[in-house]
């Protein structure tokens, strides 16, 4: 078996760390787990003894067949062969439909989790987009590049602070569980990795009137993160809000001419995005 580089495959070969991922997720007997990147089924097998239902997705046909044999004893594990994403911003319909179906037949207090050693090349779209799916996850425990994990937990003024930091922290409590060196993977990646746990705070998420608008607008605001905030907002709102309306919003929120998006904290960004949304609605 050879890793396929286009799939971003780096297999975690330290069983103690595989067990740490499962343990960090605190999976209960009525919980539903989504795993992206089945691999040979090592993590899946551990979780199968803990979860009420598992949906595991593997893009590599050879690995899918190998894992199918490994997971055959577990009838509550459903496998899907193919790409988890329909495009960069959307999960495949059958994946979320399978999650909804599993949730409908398990107790009301069951949790939905993403637990996975994620392929590096899809980690950001997988985590970012899962947070505004139906149903949204309750917890995410994933192995990703260390740099990506640091971006998720970064604060204002940090070099790692950006759209991903805002999006994750607007909906989750985030922590880095463990930093992993390249030596615990095969083949060895060129960078360190991290096990990251995100506990989704549904109250925080529900306080955002339009999650999709929030996500898209935050990404636009940080596209040129070091530019002055006014020019960034004008660019992001082009054809949607005129300059006087934008200047009124920035003035009302107390953002001066030299303000930059990378200096604003989560509350300030949230207030700005909501003010822009309300102004757009008033324009309709």
Swiss-Prot record:
The keyword Methyltransferase applies. S-adenosyl-L-methionine binds at residues 10, 12, 37, 58, 83, 117. Its EC number is 2.1.1.182. One of its GO terms (cellular component) is cytosol. SMART domains: rADc. It catalyses: adenosine(1518)/adenosine(1519) in 16S rRNA + 4 S-adenosyl-L-methionine = N(6)-dimethyladenosine(1518)/N(6)-dimethyladenosine(1519) in 16S rRNA + 4 S-adenosyl-L-homocysteine + 4 H(+). This is Ribosomal RNA small subunit methyltransferase A. The gene is rsmA.
């Amino acid at each position: 078996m050879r890793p396929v580089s286009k799939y971003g495959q780096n297999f975690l070969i330290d069983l103690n760390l595989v067990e740490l991922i499962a343990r960090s997720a605190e999976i209960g007997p009525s919980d539903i787990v989504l795993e992206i990147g089945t691999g040979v089924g090592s993590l899946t097998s551990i979780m199968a003894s803990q979860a009420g239902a598992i949906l595991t997705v593997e893009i590599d046909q050879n690995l899918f067949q190998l894992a199918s044999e490994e997971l055959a004893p577990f009838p509550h594990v459903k496998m899907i062969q193919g790409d988890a994403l329909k495009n960069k911003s959307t999960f495949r319909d059958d994946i979320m439909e399978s999650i909804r179906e599993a949730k409908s037949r398990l107790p009301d207090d069951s949790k939905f989790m993403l637990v996975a050693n994620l392929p590096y090349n899809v980690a950001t779209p997988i985590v970012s987009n899962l947070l505004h799916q139906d149903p949204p996850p309750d917890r995410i425990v994933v192995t990703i590049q260390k740099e990506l994990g640091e971006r998720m937990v970064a604060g204002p003024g940090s070099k790692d602070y950006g759209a991903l930091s805002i999006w994750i922290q607007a909906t989750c409590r985030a922590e880095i569980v463990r930093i992993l060196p390249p030596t615990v993977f095969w083949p060895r990646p060129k960078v360190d990795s991290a096990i990251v746990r995100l506990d989704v705070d549904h109250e925080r998420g529900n306080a955002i009137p339009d999650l999709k608008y929030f996500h898209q607008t935050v990404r636009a605001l940080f596209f040129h993160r070091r530019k002055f905030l006014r020019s960034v907002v004008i660019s992001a709102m082009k054809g949607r809000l005129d300059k006087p309306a934008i200047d009124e919003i920035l003035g009302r929120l107390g953002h001066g001419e030299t303000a930059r998006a990378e200096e604003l904290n989560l509350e300030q960004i949230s207030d700005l995005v909501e003010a822009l949304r309300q102004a757009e609605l008033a324009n309709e």
